[in-house]
Design a protein with these regions (language model features):
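Acidic, Ala/Val/Gly-enriched low-complexity intrinsically disordered segments
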Residues: 2-7, 14
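Glycine-biased, small-residue-rich flexible motifs in mid-sequence functional cores and linkers
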Residues: 10-12, 16-193
């Protein structure tokens, strides 16, 4: 477990986005096991629209990550991402949940997110807030997704809409040499970008 002093140092210094304009940089807010940031992490991102076949592949992938104990980082915001989170929380592997809004209050965690509270208490969850906004918006969502991609060692894409906000981010990650796996492709032509 990382010390509180180191976590605060991360928030004040290293926790600023290197990929954004100065006006968009904000310190991070962290709750949970900050040591998870030191683990190899696989990002899971998905557009809202997804085929039933891709949903099945994503659920199988999530179960495999859970069973292997791999750390997954995501915003877990789209319906598919929330399904993946539910599967992951049934295991004991580490999870980093990145919010595009301010952190949940302790009362909200207790009342509405008992599964997250249990994972926090077990030391296998880190909540990261990349925005102080009360609700996620288009700008804070892009900011969150950039943070996820920057923190990840590899990226798994459940579904990618060519016109969506994820497409340019995934293209940029591909250009930077990150390993990207698409689960929404035909299994016979499934490829790693």
């Amino acid at each position: 477990m990382v010390s509180l002093e180191l976590a605060l140092h991360f928030c004040m210094n290293a926790g600023r986005f290197s990929t954004m304009d100065d006006q968009q940089k904000q310190p991070l807010a962290l709750l949970g096991n900050t040591g998870l940031l030191n683990l190899p992490k696989t990002a899971f991102l998905s557009s809202r629209k997804v085929s039933p076949e891709a949903v099945l592949r994503c659920c199988a992938w999530a179960a495999a990550q859970r069973d292997a104990g791999r750390c997954v980082i995501s915003g877990f915001h789209s319906a598919l991402e929330r399904d993946v989170l539910r599967l992951l929380l049934k295991g004991v592997q580490p999870v980093v949940l990145v919010l595009a809004r301010r952190l949940y209050s302790p009362q909200t965690l207790e009342r509405e997110h008992a599964d997250l509270k249990r994972a926090l208490d077990d030391g296998r969850l880190l909540l990261v807030s990349t925005s102080s906004a009360g609700r996620a918006n288009a700008s804070s969502t892009i900011q969150r997704n950039r943070f996820i991609v920057d923190q990840a060692d590899e990226i798994v894409v459940g579904s990618l809409s060519p016109a969506g906000s994820l497409a340019p981010l995934i293209a940029r990650a591909d250009e930077s040499g990150k390993r990207i796996t698409r689960l929404d492709s035909n299994p016979d032509s499934s490829r790693t970008l």
